[in-house]
Amino acid sequence: AKGRRPNRLLTDALREIRNTRSRFFSLMILSALAVCFLAGLRATAPDMKISADRYLDGQKLMDLRVVSTLGLTEEDVAALADQPGVALVQGAYSVDAIAKIQDKDSVVKVISLTDEVNLPRMVEGRMPGNAQECLVEPRYLQENGLSIGDKITLDTGTGTYEDALRHETYTIVGTADSPLYIGVERGSSTLGTGKVAFYVMLPEEAFDMEAYTDAYLLADGALELPTYSQEYEDLIDSLADALDPMAQERAQLRGDSVREEAQE
């Protein structure tokens, strides 16, 4: 009797399948779909990383960003460029502003266009030709009912960056994607709602600031490494650690300089 039990179990199983045939095949199809979906994800993830790496390398996305509450001078940028492991450094400006369009206000991050790092990818229109022209991200036009050729007004508030921009009104001459923003989040702000909704790109000459707010670095050897690899992370972490003592020294010098200017 014990030797015949497996056959009986098999017979019962087959009978159950015949009696519930539609449910059985439904489960089989669902299982097959789940396996195919998982296999697709496993195959797609590496391809997505490769595509992202090519895009970021093509737009020369910075490897490190250096910021200072007191700003960064040309001397600071030059000092960073002289450090071992640094391939290139470019200073840049960024400031939060309220973009005013008719009766609608939005908090935007205003960033300076750079020609060696963080290159924008044009979607429509052209690059700005003077200090009163700007690029915006594509969805800025879509969500505000605007078109290329329309004007926006930028208000930086009454704080530290009250006079950071040379003009108030700018003509939109194109839309572009910035490699600095590859997700949906745009960051936080002390202006308006406290949440940045869009980014706007201006030529460097549109800013009226004594010092850079940011310095963007490209690391030696980083271009040859996959962006999402452990080797890349280790390289950038090592460079950041190596730059820290020099950054502390430059911050002290900058602080002393600002205090001396305030006393004069």
What is the predicted function of each stretch?
Residues 2-264:
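Membrane transport/envelope proteins' first extracytoplasmic loop
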